[in-house]
Design a protein with these regions (language model features):
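Short beta-strand edge segments in extracellular beta-sheet folds
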Residues: 102-106
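Aromatic sugar-binding surface patches on proteins
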Residues: 66-73
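Short, compositionally biased P/S/T/A/G/V-rich stretches that sit at domain boundaries
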Residues: 1-13, 18
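Short acidic/polar inter-strand loop motif in beta-rich domains
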Residues: 90-99
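Short amphipathic, basic-aromatic surface patches that mediate peripheral association
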Residues: 24-41
């Protein structure tokens, strides 16, 4: 399991725009680069990132080989009600990581 960091407010007022920042430790190996022994390193990419606010998709991104290792993704959404945000990274070789964070809306 990769280390994921999610930075966002724990509380917000209804209608506030909240900024969300995510970072995941991942090599994002393109499959084009030779290793120390000269053999091509196998491709290992995160292909898709999604964020659901309760069950509503609020952000998604497709990632490509040009994305650097440890991809940082920042986006905003509107706080509408208390709930859970679910962050999902999916990639090559069956890689899937899911993290959740709660948001309390007053």
């Amino acid at each position: 399991m990769a280390r994921a960091l999610i930075t966002m407010p724990a509380t917000a007022k209804r209608g506030d725009v909240i900024d969300i920042r995510t970072l995941i430790a991942h090599p994002m190996e393109t499959g084009y680069r030779p290793g120390a022994d000269g053999a091509i390193l196998p491709r290992n990419l995160i292909r898709r990132f999604t964020c659901h606010y309760d069950d509503v998709l609020v952000f998604s991104a497709e990632l490509f080989p040009a994305v650097a290792a440890n991809p940082f993704i920042a986006f905003s959404t509107v706080a509408i009600a208390s709930g859970t945000l679910r962050f999902v990274w999916t990639g090559d070789n069956g890689f899937t990581q899911t993290e959740t964070t709660s948001l309390v809306v007053a």
